[in-house]
Amino acid sequence: MASQIQKLLTTNQDLLLMQKGTMMRKVRTKSWKKLRYFRLQDDGMTVWHGRHLESISKPTFSISDVERIRKGQDSELLRYLVEEFPLEQGFTIVFNGRRPNLDLVANSVEEAQTWMRGLQLLVDLVARMNYQEQLDQMLREWFQQADRNQDSRMSFREAQRLLLLMNVEMDEEYAFSLFQEADVSQSNTLDSEEFVQFYKALTKRTEIEELFENFSSDKQKLTLLEFVDFLREEQKESDHSSDLALKLIDRYEPSENGRLLRVLSKDGFLSYLCSADGNIFNPDCLPIYQDMTQPLSHYYINSSHNTYLLGDQFCGQSSVEGYIRALKRGCRCVEVDTWDGPDGEPVVYHGRTLTSRILFKDVLATLAQYAFQSSDYPLILSLDNHCTWEQQKTMAHHLIAILGEQLLSTTLEEQLIDIMPSPEQLRGKILVKGKKLRTIEVVESDKEEEELEKDEGSDLDPASAELDMQSQPESQEQASGNKSKNKKKFLLQSSTTILCPDLSALVVYLRTAPFCSFTHSKENYHIYDISSFSESKAKNLIREAGNEFVQHNARQLCRVYPSGLRTDSSNYNPQEHWNVGCQMVAMNMQTAGSAMDICDGLFRQNGGSGYVLKPEFLRDTQSSFNPMKPVSLYKAQILVVQVISGQRLPKVDKTKETTVVDPLVRVELYGVPEDTKQQETSYVENNGINPYWGETFYFQIQVPELAMLRFVVKDYSRTSRNNFIGQYTLPWTCMKHGYRHVSLLSKDGTSLHPASIFVYTCMQEDLDMDEP
C-alpha cells in the first residue's frame, strides 16, 4: 500500500499538482478569510500551509487525521459566503474526532476539484491499510524525520534524535550497540532496510517471546496442538479452538512453509496478538448481534444534549455541524430547542443566552441528509418547543416538507397500542418527541390530569415551565362535560392554547409527560409517555427508590439531561443512570472526557447502531433489582487484570522533542456503586516505546452485566496533575479474556495507532492472589 502511494505521487495528475502547491483562501469565520499556501509533502501523507511558498513550518495535518472531504455546498460556513465565493470553488476537510473542520476556497473550480479528488484518494488508501502497512508508513515517516540532511541514510546522532521522537530515553552506550548491530554495511550509517532492523531491536517484545516459549516445545515454533492449547487455556477460546487455530495460522503466519506445515512462528504469534483477533474487544460484538425486535424501552439509546452547540452553554456557537458530529458518533436522539425567529422562521439556540442562532429548517435539512449514514435505526428528534402558534405551524410544515417519508407521522400498521414498536420496525424513521395535546379518549383513560411541570432544557430556564402551564390540557372535570362532542377533536383549554395541533399531530409514540411519582406514572401514563429528569433529580430517585425506577424504565422511556449549572458543557457519569435502565442519558457530545469515554465505550458494540439491549433484569417490569442494594444472581466474581507492557505511546507535548513520558496505567471499573473502583500501576521512567509494568489487580464484581472497564494511560508528573496519554473503554460483556492488546484512543476518541497496552485478564470464582 505504501509503495502504491509512492507510485501515485509520480503518476496521478491531481497529486502532482498538489505537490507543487496551491494558494487558497482559508476561512474560519464570516470575517476571517486569509490567503495561505497549501502543499502536499513528498511522503504523500502530510499537508502543510504557510503564508507563502518559502514559509518554514511543520506539517499542518496528516492524511490519517482526515475523515472525509465535503463539497462547498455542504459547508454551513461557505454557504453564508456564497455572494463572495462560488460554492463550487470551496470544499471542507473534515477531521476525525472533535478537531474543527478546515474550510478552503480555491481560485477556480478545477483547482478545488483537484484537491478534493486527491485528498479523498489518499484518505481512502489510508483507510484500507492493514496493520503492517500502517507500521511501514510510520517507519517511513520516522526515518524521514530523523534524516535531517536528507541523504537517505541515518547517522548515530540522527538515531539519537529519533529515539526522542519515538518517546524513549536510552543509555547512549546501549543505543550505540543496537545501532552497530543494525549497521550491516559497516558504514556508520543506516539505510532504510538497516533502520527497520534497528527499529525491531528497539521494540523487541521480550514478554511475548517468553509467553511463546512457555507453549513451544522447541522454542522456535508453535505446532497446531500447542497453539490450540494456548487458545483454549489462556485465551479462553474453548469453542472450535482447533478450527480457529487453523484460521489464525493461515491469517497471520508470514511463512508459506509454516502455513503448509500448520505451525506458527514467533513473528506470526506476535502478528496474531497485535491483530483484531488479539484485541481485548470481542470482534463478535462489533456487528449487529443483539435482538432488535424488542420495544424501544428495552434499549439504551445513544443521546445528545443541546446537540446544536459546539462549545459552552452560555456563549458557544450553534451550528448544524453539531448534529453532523453527533450523528457520526452514532447518536440516535438529538435535541432541538426552537424559538421564534425573524421573518416567521423558527430558530434553534440555547434560549436566553448569548449562543448564536441557526434556522430550524437548516437543522432539518441536515438531519434529512445525515440521519442514517452511520446507523439506519430510528432517530429521535427531542423537540424543546418555545415558539408561538404561528411559528409552530411553520415548524410542522418544515418537518413534513423537509423530512418527507423519513418522518414517522402515523402509528405503524398492525402495531398494538399497548406495546412500543421496536428499533427494527422503525428503521429509517425519524420520530418526534415532544408535547402532545390529548384527545378525550386519552383523558377518559387517565384517572386524573396533573398540572404539567417543566420537563426539558436547562434547570435554570423558567420558559419551559411557563409553556407547559399554558399548554396544559383541560381538567378531567372539564373533559367530562364535553363527552357528547366529537372525540377526535383536540380539547379546548381554559387559557389561550399555545401548543399547535399541527405540530402536536406529529408526536406519535414519544409524548412528553411531567413526572410526579412512580406510582402516578404507573397508574396514569401509557407506554408512550416519556418523562425527563435533570441529573440531580434522577440521582435522588436512584438513591431513594432505585427498584421503582428500574420498573418504571422497563415499562416506559425516560430521558436524563445535564444540570443547567454545567454552563461549560461538562458531563456527568452516565453509568449510574444506566444502572436503573434509563434509556436516553443525554450527553454534551462536544466535550471530551471520561464521561464521554464511558458513553462511547457502551455504544461501540452492536454495529455502532446507537441501540444496546439492556440486561434482562432491567427489562422486567416486576424486577426486584436495585443498584444501590444489588443481589447478584450468581456468586460474586473476581476480575483479574494484569497490566503487562505498553507499546509506542505518543508524546504528551510533541513540540518538546527532548521530553519523554513517564507512563503509568490506571484501570477503572464502572458499574453499580459497589463495583465502582480503580487501581493504578507505578510509573516507568523515560520510556514511551516499550514500558513494562507487570502489575496485577483484582476487582470483585457483583453485577458484571453492567460493568464497564476503562484503561487510562497517563504521564506521571511530580509537580502537577498527571497528563493524559490515551484510553480505551469497553463493556465487560464485550471483553475477550486472556492475553490481549488494548488499542489506545485520544481524548477525542480517535485512534492513536499503533499505541497500545498489553494485558492479561480472566475471571475467578474465589479470590486467589496467585499471579496469572
Curated annotation (Swiss-Prot):
Q: Which reactions fall under this protein's catalytic activity? A: a 1,2-diacyl-sn-glycero-3-phospho-(1D-myo-inositol-4,5-bisphosphate) + H2O = 1D-myo-inositol 1,4,5-trisphosphate + a 1,2-diacyl-sn-glycerol + H(+); a 1,2-diacyl-sn-glycero-3-phospho-(1D-myo-inositol) + H2O = 1D-myo-inositol 1-phosphate + a 1,2-diacyl-sn-glycerol + H(+)
Where the record annotates domain C2, the positions are 619-746
Q: Where does Ca(2+) 4 bind?
A: D662, N686
- Give all residue intervals belonging to the PH domain: 16-124
Residue stretches making up the PI-PLC X-box domain: 290-435
Q: What outcome is documented for mutating R36G in this protein?
A: Only retains weak enzyme activity and abolishes the ability of isoform 4 to act as a negative regulator
User: Which intervals carry biased composition (Polar residues)?
Assistant: 469-483
**So where does this one cross the membrane?**
none
Occurrences of domain EF-hand (ranges):
134-169, 170-205, 203-237
Top-rank EC class of the record's enzyme: hydrolase
Task: Please tell me where Ca(2+) 5 binds in this chain.
Answer: D715, Y716
Q: Which residues bind Ca(2+) 2?
A: D183, S185, S187, T189, E194
Q: Does the keyword Endoplasmic reticulum apply?
A: yes
Q: Which cofactor does it need?
A: Ca(2+)
The EC number(s) this enzyme carries = 3.1.4.11
UniProt remark on domains: The PDZ-binding motif mediates the interaction with GRIP1.
* Purpose of the protein: Hydrolyzes the phosphatidylinositol 4,5-bisphosphate (PIP2) to generate 2 second messenger molecules diacylglycerol (DAG) and inositol 1,4,5-trisphosphate (IP3). DAG mediates the activation of protein kinase C (PKC), while IP3 releases Ca(2+) from intracellular stores. Required for acrosome reaction in sperm during fertilization, probably by acting as an important enzyme for intracellular Ca(2+) mobilization in the zona pellucida-induced acrosome reaction. May play a role in cell growth. Modulates the liver regeneration in cooperation with nuclear PKC.
Q: What is this protein called?
A: 1-phosphatidylinositol 4,5-bisphosphate phosphodiesterase delta-4
* Originating species: Rattus norvegicus (Rat)
